[in-house]
Amino acid sequence: MKINGNEIRPGNVIEHEGGLWVAVKTNAVKPGKGGAYNQVELKNLINGTKLNERFRAAETVERVRLEQKDFSFLYEQGEALIFMDTETYEQLELQKDFVGDRAAFLQDGMMVTVELYEEKPIGIRLPDQVTLAITEADPVVKGQTAASSYKPAVLENGIRIPVPPFITSGERVIVDTNELTYISRA
């Protein structure tokens, strides 16, 4: 579907320079001289590179509709991650590097959303929050109560995050998978 350059909004996926790009930020600019344009920060969906482009209102770009399907994580097999389509029960195999660092957050039966373009997976979205156990937490140092302080802790999946001083080993916490930050106790 063709849209004008000034209609691009954050989250839109467009076809540009032979690739698929998602608009991260947009800024409508109206200079004193010359025509108005839309300054757009784009991120490539395949390799993650970023690009800043200007689109004039008269320019048209192809907006792409991505199909989003729900999958359930089944298991890990070497460097492959196996998911199952919840509607057709077909299995989908994705490489760990496709999911990236967030593959460590995958748990058996976890529901994820896979974005498909022409039946080919191009992106995956994990839940925003997961509940994990703390395996290691440094002891509290007395006298650090004057300012808000955090101490490092290791989650059951091996990822290190800062947590408040009252969290101890063995506790379950809710973690933000996008920012890798502590949210609350479970």
Swiss-Prot record:
Keywords: Cytoplasm, Elongation factor, Protein biosynthesis. One of its GO terms (cellular component) is cytoplasm. One of its GO terms (molecular function) is translation elongation factor activity. Pathway: Protein biosynthesis; polypeptide chain elongation. InterPro entries: Elong-fact-P_C, NA-bd_OB-fold, Rib_uL2_dom2, Transl_elong_fac_P/YeiP, Transl_elong_KOW-like, Transl_elong_P/YeiP_cen, Transl_elong_P/YeiP_CS, Transl_elongation_fac_P. SUPFAM superfamilies: Nucleic acid-binding proteins (SSF50249), Translation proteins SH3-like domain (SSF50104). It is found in: Cytoplasm. GO terms for biological process: peptide biosynthetic process. The keyword Protein biosynthesis applies. Its main location: cytoplasm. Pfam families: EFP, EFP_N, Elong-fact-P_C. Belongs to the elongation factor P family. This is Elongation factor P. It comes from Brucella ovis (strain ATCC 25840 / 63/290 / NCTC 10512). The gene is efp.
